[in-house]
Amino acid sequence: MIPDVSQALSWLESHPNALDGIRRGIERETLRVTPEGHLATTPHPAVLGKALTHPWITTDFAESLLEFITPVDGSIDHMLTFLSDIHRYVARNLGDERMWPLSMPCFIGSEQDIILAQYGSSNLGRFKTLYREGLKNRYGALMQTISGVHYNFSLPLSFWQARAGVQDADSGKAAISDGYFRLIRNYYRFGWVIPYLFGASPAICSSFLNGRESALPFERRGGTLFLPYATSLRLSDLGYTNKSQSNLGITFNHLNQYVEGLKRAIHTPSAEFARLGVEESGHYHQLNANILQIENELYAPIRPKRVTRDGESPSDALLRGGVEYIEVRSLDINPFTPIGVDADQARFLDLFLIWCVLADAPEMSSDELLCTRQNWNRVILEGRKPGQTIGIGCHDARQPLAYVGQSLFADLHRVAEVLDGINGDARYQQVCARLVAAFEDVSLTYSARVVAQMGERGIGGYGLTLAQHYRDRLCSEPLALLDETTLAVQAQRSVTRQAALESQSCESFASYLRQHAGG
């Protein structure tokens, strides 16, 4: 089940400096809510600057869905301190509102209460809001208010020089991209370990279904619906998985094939979405009627990425420079910390992603890619079930989940020793020891802890209590890295940048759409 990585680990142990210089970044989403937990209907607070142009404080789907972005960082502790400062600053500037501490929203009356994120009158700003209008019309607005954490990760050039024999990032871009695609294939095969350990959405408010039927066999406790062994309902079909994408045939074997599949999806008309219409009397319903409006609409638990240049699409950036980093998208909001993610999770992801790039990863057909989803679904819906098993490949053979998890951690511990040697401490090994215990004792998983702490209050009461507690805590903590002046200057710069974009928008929006979305 677990590939034999003993040779690769021995290589790593003899080349420890190859891992010196890992870079990371975090994106954390959170809904603004009222003291009663209802979705805020107020505009994005002006004191925070403009969501379109602020580098650290922006919005995602909804005007009330905040997104905090850390700069790229070589230190986990520094990165999380930066993220904490953003939370402290925002908490002080939300008035009565607070940040919802769970992935799944709760007290939403109707989809009409969800206001799309607003980005001003520039063509870029209108484009971003229209993309969200399309998502709402295609999949419903409620699905888009689910929050998560994204972990961006890149290995240093020294790793690729030692492991793949590349000279520099430019001439070695093909080998580096191949390495990251190997990582992605292993992530699809073994990434279910993330919702097993860290899934924190085993229950939802019944209002989330909004009267819709669900095929899931929910149990009810007051206003809470839950599955007894679930880990991450956010990653289930309740969340945003876009079933229409399952037939796209996009694979993760080679960069060119991946980009080709992506481009095919954004240029292939969809009869279903065509019925929504694109434009009527000057009012737009979506960017276009293709399977994907733009590349970001592709649902994926992990993405290959490169920083784009102005006007460049994500896939064109990949073709130009190869894969620069990967974005992990399977983390629920961690409700046990005010900032939604902690150092143990970051260190685990470092270890796991390094393991994924070292382990052999045979190429995967689109059928096998779908097949890996079965293990994910098993863990998402019944991960804590006693005696739970994991499928091996696309065959009928199974192995106990606990055994596979413990085998994986035996490898991760060796990676941890290398990283601890670089850092001169034992923190990665300590994380391994803490987390591997969850395969023997499921009560240590995040989802089990949520169920235990939720108790009779239900998920809504639990979220409200945490939201108030974290608001009080964040407002009382001093800034550690940033200061009020720096944050105020960034906010003002974002206002200036948005104003400049709006003054430059002389091209008609229809023309802009044709150029950027084939509209």
UniProtKB/Swiss-Prot annotation:
Task: Using the UniProt record, name the top-level EC class of this enzyme in a single word.
Answer: ligase
Q: Which Gene Ontology cellular component terms are annotated? A: cytosol
Catalytic function, reaction form: L-cysteine + L-glutamate + ATP = gamma-L-glutamyl-L-cysteine + ADP + phosphate + H(+)
In what pathway does it function? Sulfur metabolism; glutathione biosynthesis; glutathione from L-cysteine and L-glutamate: step 1/2
**Keyword terms of this UniProt record:** ATP-binding, Glutathione biosynthesis, Ligase, Nucleotide-binding
* Pfam families in the record: Glu_cys_ligase
Q: Name one GO biological process term.
A: glutathione biosynthetic process
What EC number(s) has UniProt assigned to this enzyme?
Answer: 6.3.2.2
| Keyword match Transmembrane | no
- GO terms for MF: ATP binding; glutamate-cysteine ligase activity; metal ion binding
Q: Can you tell me which family this protein belongs to?
A: Belongs to the glutamate--cysteine ligase type 1 family. Type 1 subfamily.
- This protein's name: Glutamate--cysteine ligase
Starting at the broadest rank, the lineage of the source organism is: Bacteria, Pseudomonadati, Pseudomonadota, Gammaproteobacteria, Enterobacterales
Q: Which gene encodes it?
A: gshA
